[in-house]
Amino acid sequence: TNTPEQDRYLQVKKYLEYVVVDNNMYRNYGNAGPCVMSAEISFEPLQEFSSCDIQEPLSQDIVQPAVCGNYYVEVGGECDCGSPKPCRSACCNAATCKLQREHQCDSGECCEKKDDCDLPEICTGRSAKCSCVISQGDLGYGMVEPGTKCTDGMVCSNEQCVDVQTAAK
């Protein structure tokens, strides 16, 4: 039986095999070492690419047709935030995997909140950069001024929430 790491390795290896598959997948390409598409499974890493590994790849996606809702932006898609229920993107239409009207992007630093000192940001859809909601003094991209209360007994200091006593030192 395999360890979890070996199982994961085999899953990734199998995926990569599909990426490089072509019409000559099991043809003998000489003594350059094992081919990625070899029928034998090996845990030994390849030292170099053999000629079979660098043949002209497929000119199209392996998955036909593209799948919307798998969190992977495929050919023809512009975004993919999963199926409609778990999708939390205001910029991506989960049903079509196309950007909402007037939007040009769906991801970037403005989508992730670091802590309570990081004000809510708005994905404008025009850039992956933040466009923050300014409710108090702003130091850039959603960061508030030092001393601003962020939770009970906590204030912002150096862009992080710290205990009031710690900030006073």
Swiss-Prot record:
PANTHER family: ADAM A DISINTEGRIN AND METALLOPROTEASE DOMAIN, DISINTEGRIN AND METALLOPROTEINASE DOMAIN-CONTAINING PROTEIN 28. It comes from Micropechis ikaheca. Its cofactor is Zn(2+). The keyword Acetylation does not apply. Belongs to the venom metalloproteinase (M12B) family. P-III subfamily. P-IIIa sub-subfamily. Expressed by the venom gland. Inhibited by EDTA, but not by PMSF. GO terms for biological process: proteolysis; venom-mediated blood coagulation. Residues 65-129 form the Disintegrin domain. Its EC number is 3.4.24.-. Binds 1 zinc ion per subunit. Disulfide bonds join C68-C97, C79-C92, C81-C87, C105-C111, C110-C123, C150-C161. A motif (D/ECD-tripeptide) lies at residues 116-118. Keywords: Blood coagulation cascade activating toxin, Disulfide bond, Hemostasis impairing toxin, Hydrolase, Metal-binding, Metalloprotease, Protease, Prothrombin activator, Secreted, Toxin, Zinc. Residues 14-57 form the Peptidase M12B domain. The keyword Secreted applies. This is Zinc metalloproteinase-disintegrin-like mikarin. It is found in: Secreted. Snake venom zinc metalloproteinase that calcium-independently catalyzes the conversion of prothrombin (F2) to alpha-thrombin through the formation of a thrombin intermediate. GO terms for molecular function: metal ion binding; metalloendopeptidase activity; peptidase activator activity; toxin activity. One of its GO terms (cellular component) is host extracellular space.
